[in-house]
Amino acid sequence: MIIRLRFYLSLTLCALSFALFSQEFSISGKVMDSNNTPVELANVVIFTEDGTTFFEGTSTDENGFFKLNNLLESTYLIKISFIGYEDFEQKIILSGHLDLKTIQLNETPESLGEVTVIAKKPTITRKPDRLIFNIENTALTEGSTLSVLKNTPGVIVSEGNINIKSAPATVFINNRRVQLTSDELMQLLESAPANSIKSVEVITNPPASYDADSGAVINIIMSKNLVTGYRGNAYTNYTQGVFPRYNVGTSHYFKNNKVNLNVNYNYTNQKINRDQDDVVNYLNPSNEVEEIWRSNVNRNTWSETHNLNLNFDYYIDDKNTLSLTSTGLYTPYFKYQIRNNTNITDANLNFLSRFTADNLSRDNKYNIGSDLIFRHDFDNSANLIFNAHYTTYDYKRDQDVLSNFFDQNNVFNDSSEFNTAANQVTEIITGKVDYSLPINETSSFEAGIKYSNVNTDSDITKLDIINGSEVIDPNNSNAFIYDENVFAAYSNYSKSWEKWDINLGLRVEQTRIEGESVTLSEINTQDYLNWFPNVSISHQILENTSIYGSYKRSITRPSYTDLNPFTFFLNENTVVLGNPNLVPSYRDHYKIGTNFLEYFTVEAYYMNYDGDIVELPRQNNETNVISYTPTNLDKKVDFGFDFAFDYYPTNTWNLYFVTSFYNISEEANFGEGFVELDQWSNYSILQNSFSLLEDRSLNVNFTLTWVGKNLQQLQTVEDRLFSELSVSKTVLNKKGIISLSVEDLFNMQDSDLRLGYLNQSSSSFVDSDNRFIKLGFRYNFGNTKLNTNERTTSAEERQRLKDLN
């Protein structure tokens, strides 16, 4: 199906390029109901033969009449739809002016009844720069948005991170970046229902219109709407993991000829558990084990979160639209407790001492981002978009840490206690202008400019408790002021002819940064200009065979918190450090691939990182302190080969399989020696999707994802198996939907990490709260055929917000 789509698309684009030399025809007809009454304002749309590419569209007049002009000789698919009627579809061969006479639409008692033929379009679509995962009307849409990403081919969600294979991914919704901290992003995706999602695009080669630091992109496409009216829903989910957690929410959408209004709210209450076993081998100058520290760490997180999203569109006239988007997240209650019990032995496992550390943190934060957007459409189909964005982010954390120390006889002999107070206020202002011009039927041009400013003011105060009184620790108290300005411009050109498609883009960014450590009286500045080209090309060799390739250069800037020189204590022997000397990381990404025999795809890729930014645990063998600090690797290379198979054994069963064999190598110089590590690994996914019962009202999805032993940030991560089963069933005349999902069926998603190079030797086993069962219910009311204008705020700079921890 994928190859056939590419073939027809190429033929169509080729035909359009010679439109001036070809004869044009028309299609006309009259739409009536079963009572022989004209159906006014019915949507009449012409697609390519396979129904995937839109050509022309119109609406019927008051007499039910329609006419589509300027059509070339070809085979088309015509679709006619109107609220309350079953859709009409017919394949037509156009070789002259065609009058379809009278077309009758039959009434249907269910407004959603027509959305059942899921198997007519493929689940997976591949393009030179992206993979499109279509999930509309599957069981996945009754889970959370995070669950959808976990089932998306190539995407790995683990330990609060979202990666496309080994590369961190940036999340967009309807081409607008989700601007939250990493923790907030996970909360949002877990609490947001997936019922409005149409597809997920995994973009490995984003065009130049994306910021250069976007890297690999996950773009969540929401269903679009052509119908006026009101729609709403209310939903709730209950999840049982180690502890119970629940989520409730409601969505409301209204549309008329002048206004689109969409409001979403949800509330999440959860307690998350995490158990961790750590082993650190502290070494002597000869790199022989001197002491072994074994720690059992239990982490519990309690939180209450409110999410509110507002989208408003005002259609001034046919050419001008004004939009307002606002996203707010408020966390009034967040408690984070760490209980640590560490036993210390010598190399022969003889007990030497132990200590306990209890860390209790309480957070309060809000994050509000808003966009004001104006769009003007020109008569030549070009458009001009102005976008202004503002974010305000406020974060506070109070922490209490108590450590008790025991001697060789396990007798208490000392204790220490300290408190910290951390604050961070961030403001982001951006403005951009984008211009898009269709040059002709086969080519288009895009260009744009952007300015962004980020200002962060943060401080931390450490208070030692001595004889019951708080005493400021000046060596670990500080204030940090950060200011960043980025000026950017881009252009993009795309062209299709005969059996070729090409896209060329270039982006330039000028960055100016100043970071001031107030207490240390240190100022660090960076000023650099970078060029970021990208290109993708595809060629249809045969009807069922195509080849493609792409290249993109991108940048990863350090987060504002990573550049902050603060020292944040988890306990007396474990700290998190910022690094004001971090520099940006650059990535060159090459890819070639082929689609053949309709069901198969083979790809090869190569990614070279210069200065990849990673957070490493570094042990000090003299002070017995573990420091987690971000640093730049000298070099990282990731290359591999992918094989994909997408097939429908029946019209109600889709089978998708992909396997990837890849190698990651990392190099770093820490002063005491040069480190070079590499590891071959395998990533495989097997996904089965079923639509059951006569009305296709029961949907089932089962996914297995295997991630073999691999290298991440100079650490070896052992094999893991991710699994998820999701089921959904429509009830109450298709107004209600019951969903059930189970994750980590085989209890194999936990992380087992090992680190060993130079004078570093440690391991960690992390048992996360990712094995659970979730039960959900959603009830729809109003005009359920409506789809929303849901989107999120767009300032890419918000993605680099991080909490102080």
Q: What are the roles of these predicted feature ranges?
A:
Residues 211-218, 226-277, 303-306:
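Outer-membrane beta-barrel translocator/receptor signature
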Residues 32, 43-47, 81-85, 95, ...:
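Short, acidic, small-residue-rich periplasmic hinge/interaction motif at the N-terminus
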Residues 428-432, 473-478, 583, 589, ...:
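Outer membrane beta-barrel strand-and-loop segments of large Gram-negative receptors
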Residues 100-104, 146-148, 187-188, 202, ...:
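N-terminal periplasmic accessory domains that precede
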Residues 512-514, 543-589, 604-625, 745-758:
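Surface-exposed extracellular loop regions of Gram-negative outer-membrane beta-barrel proteins
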